[in-house]
Amino acid sequence: MQEANAADQTPFSPVIGVDIGGTQLRTAVLLGGQLRSRVSMITGANPTPERILPRILRAIEQAIDEAHIPRNTLAGIGVAMPGPLDYRTGIIYSPPNLPGWGQVPLRDIFLQHYTLPVYIENDAHTAALGEYMFGSGRGCKNLVYLTISTGIGGGVIIDGKILEGANGTAAELGHMSIDWHGQRCSCGNMGCLEYLASGTAIARMANEAIADGQGAELLAFASTMLAHPTTAPDQAALPAVQEPEALEQDDMDDGEEPLRVNARTVARAA
């Protein structure tokens, strides 16, 4: 596990943050945990390293200029992006939402341009760390963070440390199969949670519904959901995590059985 200790941060040294996502690219300069500048752009089609990395390097330069800080005071660069990746070596291993990123030595690429320490980490893990240090997780020893965006991912902090797992893919629940007879996900598995419930999946299913002549029903459903936002935990869903066996086997088809298994796994880890 990696230590997640806010006390280790040098509060007066500016740092560069980079977020490489399947939908958006972001760079920022932070000083003492406060945002000094930020540059955002759309990832775009065909997001290969050859197309994206030059844009990111230009965005970093823009963020530094807009932050109005001396370059010789920069302490390091932190890069968050979808896994799988090796945070020790900084090598990226074919993220499903970023085609063409197989075996990319991302840390070495950044080191060719900057004489600064460079840290590469799974984006959901960094989000969990941010929540632990600066958000709702402050004061907690343990937390689970779930992200639902272009994909679905998770990060776990246990006793103040990031849970990496054997190969850095701990809490990658987006690519757990919840329907073994479902459609093939971009990762190659069948019926992944990400394929069925991510932001990308919701957009895909909405387009399919519109193409099938269900646009009016979809709009009515969306209006109802917006009129009644969720403001508290769904009490009906809690037994699925607290007591997975409460999901009776007789009430499940083949696609729902993996959900019970995954719920049991989460409950045991909690």
Where do the protein language model's features map onto the residues?
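Short acidic-glycine loop/turn motifs at beta-strand connectors
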Residues: 31-34, 88, 158-159, 180
